[in-house]
């Protein structure tokens, strides 16, 4: 439930490339617009609401974080196995989702010098994943595979948090060299004539949450807080860049309205893998460009909902148990 804090046993401690804490922003209002005071100036302040900004978790893509971000942003999660664990994740549908248009919620603990003289020690309750972005780049190292998740929260919090954080977990991270399957709309970019032509990719998910203020939504410190995050018109976007060569079929697929599956897989080892299977992809835009002096095409995919298989299926194997369960 949105107002239920996580227990310490379910808290996962991890690193974040975003060094800023998640800010709390209480909003006050005044009586400036009211007449009858004898002047135009404000005379009183009133508590209004917590206007909590979105917060970005930015990380090198690991099996653990990908499983977490996909699970909490899409909502329909099935876990199987016993170390490693396999998560099969698809977008929840309002007609069958037990919580309607709401996704699973989590708590966020942030601490600076915890203990008797803590600078910051609080737990934000009722957080949700607004969206994520997966970026694959033509570069070496961990930065070649990045994932960020944009999170929102209601304004409810507990301070001090009452949480003793566990030891930091060791992530099992991917890089672009670990891509083991890369076929978009019938074009295999790992083997055959299109091998070695793939440059980069960005995939993103956006839940477009509706405002969560309503009668009875709740209050903290006398300020109104949000009481739900319901998804709006969700958006799934994929863009990728490939080198142009003689006989490239991307333009033909665009003009002929050709659709097909798209499979993207990263494999670190038997215990850590990530697969994004788009059930029906077409090409919306194919734009000529230049990448490091090489002629390239930037392809904007359009992901279509298939009546049998849905839109996208994420299959993730990771040692981390109990995500979104």
Predicted region positions:
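Signature of extracytoplasmic/envelope-associated structural regions
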Residues: 1-325
């Amino acid at each position: 439930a949105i107002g239920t804090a996580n227990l310490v046993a379910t808290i996962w401690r991890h690193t974040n490339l975003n060094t800023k804490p998640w800010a709390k922003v209480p909003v006050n209002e005044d009586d400036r617009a009211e007449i009858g005071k004898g002047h135009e100036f404000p005379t009183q302040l009133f508590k209004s609401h917590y206007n909590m900004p979105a917060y970005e978790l930015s990380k090198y893509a690991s099996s653990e974080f990908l499983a977490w971000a996909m699970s909490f942003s899409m909502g329909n999660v099935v876990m199987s196995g016993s170390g490693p664990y396999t998560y099969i994740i698809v977008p929840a549908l309002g007609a069958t989702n037990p919580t309607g248009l709401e996704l699973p919620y989590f708590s966020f603990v942030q601490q600076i010098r915890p203990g008797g003289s803590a600078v910051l020690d609080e737990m934000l309750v009722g957080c949700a994943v607004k969206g994520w972005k997966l970026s694959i780049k033509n570069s070496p190292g961990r930065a070649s595979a990045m994932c960020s998740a944009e999170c929102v929260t209601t304004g409810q919090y507990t301070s001090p948090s009452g949480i003793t954080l566990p030891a930091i977990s060791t992530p099992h991270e991917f890089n672009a060299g670990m891509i083991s399957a890369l076929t978009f709309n019938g074009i295999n970019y790992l083997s055959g004539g299109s091998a070695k032509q793939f440059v980069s990719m960005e995939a993103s998910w956006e839940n477009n949450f509706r405002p969560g203020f309503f009668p009875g939504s709740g209050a903290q410190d006398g300020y109104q807080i949000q009481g739900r995050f319901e998804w709006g018109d969700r958006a799934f976007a994929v863009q990728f860049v490939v080198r142009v060569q003689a006989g490239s079929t991307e333009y033909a697929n665009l003009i002929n309205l050709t659709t097909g599956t798209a499979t993207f897989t990263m494999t670190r080892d038997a215990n850590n893998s990530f697969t994004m299977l788009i059930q029906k992809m077409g090409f919306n835009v194919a734009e000529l460009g230049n990448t490091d002096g090489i002629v390239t095409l930037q392809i904007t995919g359009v992901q279509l909902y298939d009546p049998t298989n849905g839109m996208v299926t994420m299959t993730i194997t990771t040692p981390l148990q109990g995500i979104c369960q």
